[in-house]
Amino acid sequence: RQMCIRDRGYAACENAEKGNYRDGNFGAGTGATVGKLYGPEFCMKSGIGSYAVQIGELQVGAIVAVNALGDIYDWKNGKKVAGLLEKDKKSFLCTEDEVYKSYEVVKNKFVANTTIGAVITNAAFHKTQLCKIASMTHNGYARSIRPVHTTADGDSIYALSTGTLEADLDMVGTLAAQVMSEAILRAVMSAELSLIHI
């Protein structure tokens, strides 16, 4: 008997609770790619990534599905780790440089892109503060994805609070951006068959 969509959704939730989560091209990361300016032939595999830190009692974590038009950089050293490939598929092109080659409107831009993430903390914040944390977390996207927030991307971040710990909003927002940068890096580094070493 074939499972209906509702049954599949329920089964997916049950499996998620069993500790089956993996970074890389699994779950929401299945089918994710990066560096898609010239279409699927020259892009690289990506996936879903996560990372969390604890400072004292404060916990901040991020999870992100990285399916971006742009290239991915290691936020710690600025080195490109995934993205638009040259025709020989042995080296990278720079998506930003390729975009700068012409200011004319590109009608057939590869538009099936979105990087969607969430940042979660055990600190207590209300809705307006969580919106600010989500906004600050976009700095993690900017450190790691270039270009980011284009009209061909649907980039978004959601912030959630699960606790009652009192913490400084600016500290948590700044830390959230760093945690998100690492989650993005882990998404591409964990994807199977994704990386070339240059």
Identify the residue ranges that each predicted region occupies.
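Internal helix-turn-beta structural module
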Residues: 149-150, 155-195
